[in-house]
């Protein structure tokens, strides 16, 4: 089953407060007291935010089969929300604490499983009326992974920044100049558009191609959370033209040696950079996504260069890299002018909290077996303040400190 990150967004109607700050009367004999007290101090009292980890049926999509988040996974996400989201904006925003009290969502709601959709995708998070963010699939949380489909960025942090951007955008609208950059390219059927084709059209993701509002939120959130290697890889994809084509006839499709079968069964064994990859449409049908190549106008056959190599088309119609950079520039100016937030400093701070840095403050990189640049996860490394434990252990102990001796 194909999976994809879906972020549901509805029209925002921001309210400064939707519940009071009266004493909650926590049960000190409860097994969950430590987490409950931590959430009360660090979210409810600090920012008027209810952090709900005990799944509430009425607060979820009743058409989906969902289970609650586990206590341990809820603890992990709670400290990560504070460390990777709230503490950063508190440090960088011009109004410090006041900024978050004004613009933070009023409810953060967790579910253990994602929302499984009929088209084969999974909903990992969504926002409701600008006051509530639901983070799903919490039981998959693995703080050992930052990048990748099941990494913290894709599963959680991207959603947080995406929805928070919507709240800021609804308070002070993003510039109209942004809306006309990709006029005519927005696509209501974005879920059937591969990321490569969307990126080649000047969008950071296929979801960004849904409309200018999602384009704005996706541009900001991806710029913040993507590390430099992944951002550069996306821009490289943007430098090419891409095409989506049908597989060949059913006879080839059914063959165990066909490209179709190889792509579905052994996708990691083939160089998708040169031959492309399969993509599942919302209808369940598979298409082939590949770079567009230079072809003979008469025969349709590939035209090779003097070294006998296939030639690829580069931005025949759209300078996608320039388009993406233009969108980021507008976001950079808007955040600085309206919220006194330096987008590049925000990105740098987020990534320095995610990854290890050297003595000069540069992110430490390494290369995996496939030649891909990777970064060292700071959460799993020794805490500089207490080298005998990892940073994640130290964060979790801030919850344990609330435990009552019995």
Residue ranges and their predicted role:
Residues 89-110, 171-172, 230-246, 339-352:
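Surface-exposed patches in mature extracellular/periplasmic domains of secreted proteins
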Residues 179-229:
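Post-HExxH zinc-binding segment in Zn-dependent metallohydrolases
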Residues 10-94, 98, 283, 314-317, ...:
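Acidic/polar, low-complexity intrinsically disordered N-terminal segments immediately downstream
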Residues 63-71, 143-151, 155, 202-210, ...:
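Second-shell loop/turn segments in exported
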Residues 14, 75-133:
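Auxiliary, metal-adjacent structural segments of Zn-dependent hydrolase domains
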Residues 135, 147-175, 217:
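Active-site recognition of the HExxH zinc-binding catalytic motif
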């Amino acid at each position: 089953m194909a999976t994809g990150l879906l972020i549901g967004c509805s029209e925002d109607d921001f309210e400064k407060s939707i519940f009071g700050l009266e004493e909650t009367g926590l049960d000190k004999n409860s097994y969950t007291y430590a987490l409950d007290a931590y959430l009360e101090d660090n979210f409810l009292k600090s920012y008027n935010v209810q952090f709900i980890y005990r799944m509430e049926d009425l607060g979820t999509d009743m058409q989906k089969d969902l289970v609650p988040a586990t206590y341990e996974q809820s603890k992990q996400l709670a400290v990560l929300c504070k460390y990777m989201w709230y503490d950063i904006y508190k440090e960088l925003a011009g109004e410090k604490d006041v900024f978050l009290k004004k613009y933070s969502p009023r409810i953060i709601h967790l579910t253990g499983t994602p929302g499984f959709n009929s088209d084969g995708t999974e909903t990992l998070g969504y926002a409701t009326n600008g006051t509530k963010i639901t983070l799903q699939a919490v039981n998959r949380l693995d703080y050992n992974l930052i990048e990748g489909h099941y990494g913290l960025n894709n599963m959680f942090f991207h959603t947080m920044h995406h929805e928070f951007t919507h709240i800021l955008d609804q308070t002070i609208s993003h510039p109209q100049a942004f809306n006309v950059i990709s006029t005519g390219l927005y696509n209501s059927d974005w879920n059937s558009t591969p990321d490569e084709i969307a990126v080649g059209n000047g969008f950071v993701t296929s979801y960004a191609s849904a409309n200018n509002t999602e384009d704005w939120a996706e541009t900001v959130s991806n710029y913040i959370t993507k590390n430099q290697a992944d951002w550069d890889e996306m821009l490289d994809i943007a430098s090419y033209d891409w095409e989506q084509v049908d597989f060949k006839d059913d006879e080839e499709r059914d063959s165990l040696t066909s490209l179709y079968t190889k792509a579905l069964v052994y996708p990691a064994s083939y160089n998708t950079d040169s031959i492309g990859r399969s993509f599942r449409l919302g209808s369940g049908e598979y298409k082939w996504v590949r770079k567009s190549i230079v072809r003979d106008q008469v025969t349709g056959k590939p035209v090779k260069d003097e070294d006998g190599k296939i030639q690829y088309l580069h931005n025949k119609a759209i300078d996608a890299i320039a388009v993406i950079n233009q969108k980021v520039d507008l976001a950079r100016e808007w955040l600085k002018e309206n919220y006194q937030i330096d987008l590049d400093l925000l990105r740098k701070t987020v990534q320095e909290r995610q990854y290890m840095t050297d003595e000069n403050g540069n992110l430490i990189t390494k290369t995996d077996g496939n030649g891909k640049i990777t970064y060292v996860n700071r959460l799993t490394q020794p805490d500089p303040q207490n080298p005998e434990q990892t940073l994640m252990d130290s964060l979790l102990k801030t919850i344990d400190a609330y435990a009552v001796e019995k």
